[in-house]
């Protein structure tokens, strides 16, 4: 996974849903700072967060992993 592409993917879907970083963070029980780091390409979510993230964004885990 490319962290920059991953971050852009997450940010695009989040914005399409009209959510703030804080709203997405609350839905998956992480901090808004974590979401910010991901979206800026500075890291990835913990493996245990990938499935909940995919679920709330309504995408497959595969789509997230390929982003």
Predicted segments, located by residue:
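A short, Lys/Arg-rich alpha-helix, primarily the initiator
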Residues: 1-16
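Residues that cap or flank secondary-structure elements
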Residues: 2, 41-42
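Short, flexible micro-motifs
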Residues: 10, 44-46
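Residues in the recognition helix of alpha-helical DNA-binding motifs
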Residues: 13, 27, 38, 67
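Short alpha-helical DNA-recognition segment
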Residues: 18-37, 43, 52, 56
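DNA major-groove recognition helix of helix-turn-helix/homeodomain DNA-binding modules
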Residues: 48-63
């Amino acid at each position: 996974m490319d962290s920059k592409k991953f971050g852009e993917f997450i940010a695009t879907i989040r914005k399409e849903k009209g959510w703030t970083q804080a709203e997405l963070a609350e839905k998956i029980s992480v901090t808004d700072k974590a979401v910010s780091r991901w979206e800026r390409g500075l890291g990835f979510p913990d493996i245990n967060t990938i499935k909940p993230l995919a679920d709330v964004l309504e995408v497959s885990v595969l789509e997230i992993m390929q982003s």
